[in-house]
Amino acid sequence: MVLNENDKEFVKKLFDSLDKDNNGKLTREEIKEGFFKLRIPSSEKDIESFLTNVDKDKDGSVSFKEFEDFTIENIKKLKIVFEELDTNKSGTLDIHEIEESIKKLNIPLYSEQELIRLFHRIDKNRDNQIDFNEWRELLVLLPNSNLQLIISFWKDSQILDAGFDNGGFIPPMVEKKEKASSLRNTITYMLAGSVAGFASRTSTAPLERVKIMCQLNHGKPISLISAFKACYKDGGIKGFFRGNLANIIKVSPESAVKFGTYEYVKKLFAENDCELTSAQRFISGSVAGVVSHTTLFPLEVVRLRLSAEIAGTYNGIFDCFKKIAISEKSIRPFYRGLGASITATIPHSGVNMMVYEFLKHKVIKMTGNEFPTAGQLLVCASTSSVCGQLVGYPFHVVKSRLITQGSSVNQEKYTGLFDGLTKIIKKEGPIGLYKGIVPSFMKSIPSHSITFIVYEGFKKAFDVNLKEKKHH
């Protein structure tokens, strides 16, 4: 393979940059310092290995001729590897070609963010294409130029961006540190979920109240304007926020449990996030939804009762708990509708998380950015919210009626989920199962958008993705 003048000029400039005293020879110290700056492993063992391969006359230093022979031979090998990776023969490598090569070599990647960091490690001018000059600059001094070693070094060399340990790679974390990091990440997920839940529910509380009023209406569907007027008449501005405190008390820990569980279940399927299938994301989302919803379901009952009843029926959360318990002399009313709720949560939460993550990862790959923008997250969250609601909404309607049955706003009696579905369809038609879905969309789309934007923002602020990438 013929080298061009550009390659020879590159070798001369590289040698001169390492030869600090300009005496035409590279000492062990100059090589070590140069490797350190180039972010190449530079432990004593690495330097010794380099000298063994390059210092042919064994005088303890590297002349320009020795350096030139070694690097030119490496450049020839690098060109062969580059052409092997360049499957579309464009003369450059794009992120999809790199991803396919990594998959073929079975080298693990934690996430799309790691793939993009890896790509940008070489793509210095950020044009989303790696030309041979960029490829050569990072890899020319590797002692071996086979594809497996190149990709592994390229991937692992990202660790050097965070610092060095005695001039070499940072050693692997011991198990205790990995566990501590995993615990910190779990706490971060839960904190992010909690704050996201608080922010989203408070900002959309009026729409939640209107949605519940529509769900509990047994007659002809009422218009949004009529529902808003009824809410305002029953308590003024405060009427729109009735039940919101119970909602916050419920949703903040519920969101914390949901996101913490979701990330945990994903890890059971695969250490690397980008290896997960859509089915595995669906299962992770469903399990997270069921665990979080079941854990705090009594608060869901109180929230719905506070939102549904007329002003003055209950004097706050604890009074609502007390009156519900006294009226039926058991804890059963606090779990009435749980079956319908779980039935609704499985497809709703599963589809929601599956679609959201699918779209988010697509955006990351398409844009080449490590993190989607707030606008892009809004589109992902909105789409996933609509998909989740379409499959789970009828069960939410039945759940709301099961929870509030026997109250002043819902005198109808249901024995369970199937009975509820049957009676609603019989008396109100199939449209009865979708009563309140318009205000539900109006509430859930901004609510989910706020939730995911805050959640992803927290993860980014605490650098969770990068931390996990280092430990996996």
Swiss-Prot record:
Q: What induces it?
A: Down-regulated by phagocytic stimuli.
Q: Which PANTHER family is this protein grouped with?
A: SOLUTE CARRIER FAMILY 25
Q: Which is an annotated GO molecular function term of this record?
A: ATP transmembrane transporter activity
Q: What does this protein do?
A: Calcium-dependent mitochondrial solute carrier. Mitochondrial solute carriers shuttle metabolites, nucleotides, and cofactors through the mitochondrial inner membrane.
Binding site residues for Ca(2+) 2: 55, 57, 59, 61, 66
Which keywords accompany this UniProt record? Calcium, Membrane, Metal-binding, Mitochondrion, Mitochondrion inner membrane, Repeat, Transmembrane, Transmembrane helix, Transport
This entry carries the following GO cellular component terms, namely: mitochondrial inner membrane; mitochondrion
UniProt keyword annotation of Nucleotidyltransferase present? no
Give the residues the record marks as binding Ca(2+) 1. 19, 21, 23, 25, 30
UniProt subcellular location:
Mitochondrion inner membrane
Q: Which family does it belong to?
A: Belongs to the mitochondrial carrier (TC 2.A.29) family.
Q: What is this protein called?
A: Mitochondrial substrate carrier family protein C
At which positions is Ca(2+) 4 bound? 123, 125, 127, 129, 134
Which InterPro entries is this protein grouped with?
EF-hand-dom_pair, EF_Hand_1_Ca_BS, EF_hand_dom, Mit_carrier, Mitochondrial_sb/sol_carrier, Mt_carrier_dom_sf
Listed as disulfide-bonded, the cysteine pairs are none
Q: Which species is this record about?
A: Dictyostelium discoideum (Social amoeba)
